[in-house]
A protein has these predicted regions:
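Conserved SAM/SAH cofactor-binding pocket of Class I
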Residues: 125-232, 259
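Short loop/edge segments at beta-strand edges and connector loops
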Residues: 103, 201-202, 278, 302
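Conserved Class I SAM-dependent methyltransferase catalytic core
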Residues: 250-313
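Mobile active-site "lid"/loop adjacent to the S-adenosyl-L-methionine
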Residues: 224-256
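Conserved hydrophobic residues forming the short capping helix/wall of the S-adenosyl-L-methionine
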Residues: 46, 137, 190, 264, ...
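Conserved AdoMet
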Residues: 60-136
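Cysteine-centered motifs
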Residues: 3-5, 10
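Non-catalytic accessory regions of SAM-dependent methyltransferases
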Residues: 22-71, 75-78
Length: 315
């Protein structure tokens, strides 16, 4: 490329190639961002209210900026490195990646849990299940030594097992999963939050047949979404959260519940209790399955949104 200016020739292409770093830096420094613009960038994925909450969380957790700070122009005062970091995070949000994975943590039961791709992000419904177990824990008989032994099957981030260990201090809590990532993240969260949890790699579908009256409580939030339901799921969940922790075959939606419940028939102590978070579409079927296995005092509860979501059964 060649241009002529006031009779002087200049090689524009050579100039751009030689000075591209300077020009790029100059351009990025001139970019101005405001809160509304950030929200608009992800409004095609989330509704405006949720998009606003996500951007607020991102700015607060990653840059220490409150909404008041942002309204007072704090975005314009970000350093060049911070601006680049924010832009990178926004690009990830635009691709549908959950904000919890981007900031590396999620709130659960008043605590912050480390999360990363490969473990499910804790949900509010699971907090309700934990509350139910905590409320009934005083009525659960311990073993001969007075201890109460709790098992979390499919621990994921450890949100259930770690929380129960902290909320029920007289309990000895163990956690199973088949994912190296899940076991590592659970261990990380237990250490960070000061909880004592024994962590094991164990497949729920191949639980030890020789276990006899080990546990006072078994709790699980296993995979329960049928493959056919995937088309109704949100993009950020479907494309980014681990499918092995979400889905079961359409032909056998109770696969994990049945396996864990069968294990519980011999691994739970007399008077022991089984707690499940369930697929809202299969509440009655899950109750019937538990009855057929000999469980009693079965209770099906709805979550805060009015959906069948939790079951407790006694043995």
């Amino acid at each position: 490329m060649y241009c002529s200016c006031n009779g002087l020739g200049c090689d524009l292409q050579g100039f751009l190639l030689h000075h591209w770093k300077f020009l790029f830096t100059f351009a990025t420094r001139k970019i101005k961002m405001n809160f509304k613009q950030l929200v608009n960038r992800i409004s095609g994925i989330y509704d405006e209210r949720e998009a606003s909450s996500i951007v607020k969380m991102l700015l607060e957790e990653s840059f220490g900026l409150s909404f008041v700070d942002v309204c007072l122009g704090a975005l314009d005062k970000l350093s060049e490195d911070e601006t680049k970091s924010l832009e990178g995070m926004m690009l990830r949000l635009e691709k549908g990646e959950p904000v919890q994975y981007i900031i590396g943590r999620a709130d659960f039961y008043g605590r912050q849990f480390a999360v990363e791709p490969g473990v499910l992000i804790p949900r509010p419904e699971t907090e309700e299940l934990v509350t139910w177990i905590k409320e009934e824990s005083k009525d659960i008989r311990g073993n001969r030594n007075g201890k109460k032994y709790l098992l979390d099957v499919g621990c994921g981030s450890g949100c259930i097992s770690v929380t129960l260990a902290l909320e029920i201090p007289e309990a000895e809590v163990s956690a199973w999963d088949i994912s190296d990532t899940a076991l590592r993240v659970t261990k990380k969260n237990a250490k960070a939050l000061g909880a004592s949890v024994d962590i094991y790699m164990q497949d729920a579908l191949n639980a030890p047949s020789g276990d006899r009256e080990l546990w006072n409580v078994i709790v699980s939030n296993p995979p329960y979404i049928c493959v056919k339901e995937a088309e109704d799921m949100e993009r950020n969940v479907l494309e980014h959260e681990p499918h092995e922790a979400l889905f079961v075959p359409d032909a056998d939606p109770l696969l994990f519940y049945r396996a864990i419940a069968e294990y519980g028939t011999h691994a739970l102590c007399r008077g022991g209790r089984l707690y499940f978070e369930i697929n809202r579409a299969y509440g009655k079927e899950t109750v019937k399955m538990l009855e057929m296995l000999g469980y009693h005092d079965i209770e099906l509860r709805k979550d805060a949104f009015g959906n069948d979501r939790m079951i407790r059964a006694c043995i």
